A protein has these predicted regions:
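Glycine-rich phosphate-binding loop of actin/hexokinase-like ATP-binding domains
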Residues: 51, 67-82, 206-225
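Short beta-strands and strand-loop turn motifs
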Residues: 1, 93-97, 210
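Gly/Ser/Thr-enriched, mixed-charge loops and adjacent short helices
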Residues: 44, 61-194
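Catalytic-loop motifs flanking and including active-site residues across diverse enzymes
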Residues: 10, 32, 144, 221-225
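N-terminal small/polar loop signature for handling phosphorylated ligands or for N-terminal nucleophile
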Residues: 2-62, 150-212
């Protein structure tokens, strides 16, 4: 789930429902959408499926579900097919509910991202390829704070001046949306004030990002491409 205030309740209901049908469920708590997909393809025993509770960049009082398997995310047509199939299922006695497990998958995922960066940069200081770079992150109080604290910092980057890394489900500072003018103005201000080498801003569930260059040039939407 992302940081929305309704996230714990909705994810709890989803886990309860899956568990009641005999599924072995694991609660990742605060997570990103890309991480939820990656849990279906990473590790010795990938998960059969994953559900992300998020409404992406929409206001804090919205929420929804994103479904993933190792084949990717379910689209609207997939959801319609599932709902149609559900109408044909004859209710049966549910098996004994399974206990929900807890896992800090975001630390595993962050280590995976850091490893990819180390292998890609191939710096002389393999463990700290970003040493000497000042990179500020604006997570908008969504789920993206981990990227600064668990990816960039261990790689040697200076993340001082990063903003709104702590999750807050009412988004008190700005909408976590790299397409929003106020959000981009926030990360641009951070880059210029800190004289940073790069600024990165994420949406709430961290599947979209924007960037700001040292001179304040914004790279988001089509400009990012």
């Amino acid at each position: 789930r992302d940081s929305r205030i309704s996230g714990p309740a909705i994810s709890g209901w989803a886990l309860e429902g899956f568990g009641a049908e005999g599924a072995l469920c694991t609660n990742f708590a605060l997570a990103s959408t890309p991480a939820m997909f990656m849990c279906t393809v990473m590790g010795a025993q990938p998960f059969d499926g994953a559900v992300m509770v998020t409404a992406s960049h929409l206001p804090y009082n919205r929420n929804g579900l994103k479904f993933f398997t190792s084949a990717g995310g379910l689209e609207g047509s997939d959801i319609k097919a599932i709902l149609a199939q559900a109408q044909l299922i004859t209710p049966q006695a549910a098996p004994q509910a399974q206990q929900v497990q807890q896992q800090d998958f975001m630390s595993v995922y962050a280590a995976h991202l850091a490893s990819l960066i180390r292998d890609g940069v191939k710096a002389k200081d393999y463990l700290h390829p970003l040493a000497g770079l000042h990179i500020v992150v604006d997570a908008g109080n969504g789920a993206g704070g981990f990227f600064a604290e668990k990816v960039l910092a261990p790689l040697g980057a200076d993340i001082s001046g990063s903003r709104y890394l702590a999750p807050d489900g009412i988004f008190p500072n700005h909408i976590p949306n790299p397409e929003d003018a106020a959000a981009m103005a926030s990360i641009r201000q951070a880059v210029l004030e800190e004289k940073a080498d790069l600024g990165i801003i994420f949406d709430t569930d961290v599947d979209r990002a924007g960037a700001v260059l040292p001179d304040g040039e914004e790279l988001n939407r089509n400009r990012l491409i």
